[in-house]
């Protein structure tokens, strides 16, 4: 190990990212806000309003969301190839503009077929710019501070959970749902223009150092020079790599547990705890707000302990939190709600951090695309697992504890594989 490496603490928690680094982080927060807000949480408002506006069946509209997500999931794997061919920044801008146009078309759909096609386009392009491209830019800018940066950027997901339905409702009251989605689509296009002006794909292009640290820059330059002649990992190579599969499955188990718990949280508070709908929704909002702190906190744990150890602790935290949530005493329920909120905040942090840890800046795009596909396939099984469990048992205890165990298994899977780092 060189003297440079001996004198640098790669696990140090630091927020000295510089103006341009914080600009990158700010854009990614907003990008993840739109991803979660429009493709997940916003559907609570969009679907019933679109159905009422057009006289369509809301159940039919909602049923389109699942195949749209699956189609987008496989389409997003291909974005790594586009990034290699067109460049990371250009791909980001193009997908943002296409997402904005798709949102405008979505809001102004004249029939269900147009609704379905535009929704597939939205999910595909938003996931492309927020995850495939956005996380790749962050991996380039913050190669050793990935944990804390992912913790900060994923706050955007929780902001969306807390705010998007208020934003959509407010805009719809003035402009109808078609106008609301058109305005938000225009905002995404404006965001693409601003990104084109203020953000570079790598810190070197912006005249900055990775992690805003010249010592880190020297280490990375030496590491990347050592593998310069090696070919970049291919799709086939990534899909043969054990880290891609194990990390994709492990993170997928976290996502499966999160969707399984969150999808029944409102009904749990109403049926098992006696809350009215307004009170149950308030508990959901509280969990989302706590999740903002959780995003940052799990980023700190990731940075200090390493991503794989953080994943194991996350799985255990999830298990204990769910156990408290469903325990009969009311104080236990509040402890569980706090822990669950912290868990949903950290849920989005780990997969891009794991990809950056193992594959570094050079091979992040393809490896993350493949990991994310595996993660998405596992996560999409959540409703099937929930349906099977609910058909076998009554109440919420058994399904909740099964999801809690699944979260622990995810953490064990990730920590069980030998730690590998692109930057030592």
Please place each PLM-identified region on the residue numbering:
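Extracytoplasmic
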Residues: 23-58, 79, 261-266
């Amino acid at each position: 190990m060189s003297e440079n490496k001996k004198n640098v603490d790669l696990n140090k928690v630091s927020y000295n990212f510089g103006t341009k680094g914080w600009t990158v982080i700010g854009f990614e927060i907003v990008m993840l806000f739109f991803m979660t807000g429009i493709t997940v949480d916003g559907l609570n408002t969009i679907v019933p309003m679109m159905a009422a506006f057009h006289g369509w069946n809301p159940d039919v509209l909602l049923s389109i969301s699942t195949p749209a997500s699956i189609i987008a999931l496989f389409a997003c794997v291909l974005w790594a190839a586009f990034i290699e061919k067109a460049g990371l920044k250009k791909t980001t801008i193009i997908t943002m503009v296409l997402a904005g146009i798709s949102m405008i078309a979505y809001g102004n759909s004249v029939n269900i077929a147009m609704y379905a096609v535009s929704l597939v386009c939205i999910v595909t392009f938003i996931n492309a710019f927020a995850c495939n491209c956005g996380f790749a830019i962050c991996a380039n800018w913050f190669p050793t501070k990935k944990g804390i940066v992912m913790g900060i950027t994923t706050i955007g997901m929780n902001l969306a959970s807390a705010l998007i339905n208020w934003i959509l409702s407010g805009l719809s009251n003035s402009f109808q749902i078609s106008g609301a989605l058109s305005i938000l689509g225009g905002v995404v296009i404006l965001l693409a223009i601003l990104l084109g002006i203020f953000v570079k794909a790598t810190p070197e292009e912006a005249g900055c150092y990775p992690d805003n640290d010249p010592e880190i820059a020297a280490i990375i330059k030496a590491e990347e020079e050592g593998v310069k002649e090696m070919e970049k990992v291919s799709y086939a190579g990534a899909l043969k790599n054990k880290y891609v599969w194990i990390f994709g499955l492990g993170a997928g188990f976290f996502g499966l547990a999160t969707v399984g718990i969150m999808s029944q949280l409102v009904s749990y508070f109403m049926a098992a705890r006696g809350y009215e709908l307004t009170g149950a929704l308030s508990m959901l909002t509280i969990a989302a707000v706590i999740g903002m702190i959780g995003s940052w906190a799990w980023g700190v744990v990731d940075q200090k302990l390493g991503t794989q150890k953080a994943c194991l602790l996350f799985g255990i935290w999830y298990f204990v939190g769910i156990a408290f949530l469903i325990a009969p005493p009311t104080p236990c329920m509040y402890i569980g709600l706090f822990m669950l909120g912290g868990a949903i905040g950290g849920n989005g942090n780990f997969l891009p951090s794991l990809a950056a840890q193992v594959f570094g800046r050079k091979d992040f795009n393809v490896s993350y695309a493949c990991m994310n596909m595996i993660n998405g396939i596992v996560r999409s099984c959540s409703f099937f697992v929930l349906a099977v469990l609910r058909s076998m048992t009554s109440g919420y205890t058994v399904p909740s504890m099964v999801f809690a165990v699944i979260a622990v298994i995810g953490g064990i899977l990730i920590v069980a594989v030998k730690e590998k780092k692109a930057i030592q």
